[in-house]
Amino acid sequence: MKTSQVIQNSLRLWLKFSNANAFEQATRQPVIAQEEKLLSIIRRNRYTEYGTEHQFAKIRSVKDFQASVPINSYDTMTPYIERTLHGIPDVLTADKPLMFATTSGTTGRAKYIPVTPSYLNEYSHGIHVHTYRMLADYDNVFEGKALVSASSDIEGYTEGGLPYGAISGYLARTQPSFIRRFYALPYEICTIKQVELKYYLMLRTSLTDDVRLL
């Protein structure tokens, strides 16, 4: 059996028992699963500045949450985010952010979204479920390479000393080596700021590999 096939089979088993099974069980009772997830987030952040202001410690249900927490926009959250950007802890999240994801949104003004370890854990769970289903449906997909487009995760640093940039670049840079071996592109291409050059190198580099996944 090829080394890639051994890795693929091992990965599929790990994904199945780590996240895929739990996700499939949650789909049988999605309302309950979503409420449990919401309440776990509330409990984890109940002693933050935002959590204290909105009485997270008293929230026991979705209705409690709706009554305690107003509908927000980025503008209404900006004062909290600004303090987090300056390195003040426990404002929005109990976890210290690893970085800030940036997006221009619809206004053109840069928006900074705190990326915490617990968020990355949840984000990874979704990727794991997707990857498991892909491996189950296309058993030879990882005999080739994956063309993963990402941008730099370090475009600059906040006043608090944390990097800001693209979360896709952070994930590409921090993947384990046994996952990176399936990537068609080296991380260094992600850091190129000149868009036309970056995409040319992405296409040119991928031509040398058996790309089976975009």
Write out the residue ranges for each language-model feature.
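Active-site phosphate/ATP/adenylate-binding loop shared across adenylate-forming ligases
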Residues: 1-33, 38-55, 59-214
